[in-house]
Amino acid sequence: MKIYADADALPTPIKDILCRAAMRRGIALVLVANKALRFPESPHITAVRVGQGFDVVDGVIVERVAPGDLVITADIPLAAQVVEKDAHALNPRGERYTRDNILGKLAMRGLLSELRDSGVVTGGPPPLSNRDREAFANQLDQFLRQYTGN
């Protein structure tokens, strides 16, 4: 099992939680981004730097992810592709994307996009809070215990 992170917009506290978990549990973490990243030196952590372009990071993750892997992303279309490949997806606020909820998430994303395009200001998500960080850490820990046994 590997953990892939859509690291371009990944909040630093979430990246730090992932790095600590990978080192502590000996699980491969692959940070995929189109920019240089800072991360602790560890045999369990690698970075894949991709070229600029729309959804290039997503394409690399989808190409590499295997059933049972975990992908960390706030990108709902990417999460849908991951779930379709029988892998798992978790967003930086600790919410799991599953076969049961992904279609609803895609529909809501589409609706909000239409509202923005029509001039209705919908705003973005609020800044990552301490509660969000805690929820992410708890969900990650629960997932790793369930799927890796450690």
Curated annotation (Swiss-Prot):
Origin: domain of life: Bacteria
Organism: Solidesulfovibrio magneticus (strain ATCC 700980 / DSM 13731 / RS-1)
Entry's family note: Belongs to the UPF0178 family.
CDD domains per UniProt: PIN_YqxD-like (cd18720)
Name assigned to this protein: UPF0178 protein DMR_20710
